[in-house]
């Protein structure tokens, strides 16, 4: 679960290393974000020469959460960290590579470009 002020690891090669969630998109009373939700975030840590700079406000989609969640088949899944991929206005990733596994729920949310770039889909 991701909420305001949550820090997330960035799982792509845009140059950002860590972002801080400003808002979970999807309505005025949405408190928590789950895998597949889009957030507005601020870049807190970035590498020099990257596509995004520190302090930049970006949109990102959550690809991993440390809090376990249930699936319709009755199984549960959780990851070691909270991670997101920075996306543009067209919901396509701004980076060209994705690091680490991503959740299968992204397929249902129509983030097919992220699914195709990911090394592993769990």
From Swiss-Prot:
One of its GO terms (cellular component) is cytosolic large ribosomal subunit. InterPro entries: Ribosomal_uL14 (IPR000218), Ribosomal_uL14_bac-type (IPR005745), Ribosomal_uL14_CS (IPR019972), Ribosomal_uL14_sf (IPR036853). The keyword Transmembrane does not apply. SUPFAM superfamilies: Ribosomal protein L14. Keywords: Ribonucleoprotein, Ribosomal protein, RNA-binding, rRNA-binding. The keyword Calcium does not apply. Pfam families: Ribosomal_L14 (PF00238). One of its GO terms (biological process) is translation. One of its GO terms (molecular function) is large ribosomal subunit rRNA binding. PROSITE patterns: RIBOSOMAL_L14. Signal peptide: none annotated. Belongs to the universal ribosomal protein uL14 family. NCBIfam families: rplN_bact. HAMAP family: Ribosomal_uL14. Binds to 23S rRNA. Forms part of two intersubunit bridges in the 70S ribosome. Part of the 50S ribosomal subunit. Forms a cluster with proteins L3 and L19. In the 70S ribosome, L14 and L19 interact and together make contacts with the 16S rRNA in bridges B5 and B8. This is Large ribosomal subunit protein uL14. It comes from Roseiflexus castenholzii (strain DSM 13941 / HLO8). The gene is rplN.
């Amino acid at each position: 679960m991701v909420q305001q002020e949550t820090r997330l690891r960035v799982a792509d090669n845009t140059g950002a290393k860590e972002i801080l969630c400003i808002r979970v998109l999807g309505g005025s009373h949405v408190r928590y974000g789950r895998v597949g939700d889009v957030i507005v975030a601020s870049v807190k840590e970035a590498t020099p020469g990257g596509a995004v700079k520190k302090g930049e406000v970006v949109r990102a989609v959550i690809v991993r959460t440390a809090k376990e969640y249930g699936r319709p088949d009755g199984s549960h899944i959780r990851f070691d960290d909270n991670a997101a991929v920075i996306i543009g206005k067209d919901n396509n990733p701004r980076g060209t590579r994705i690091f680490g596994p991503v959740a299968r729920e992204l397929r249902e949310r129509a983030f097919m470009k992220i699914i195709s770039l990911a090394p592993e889909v769990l």
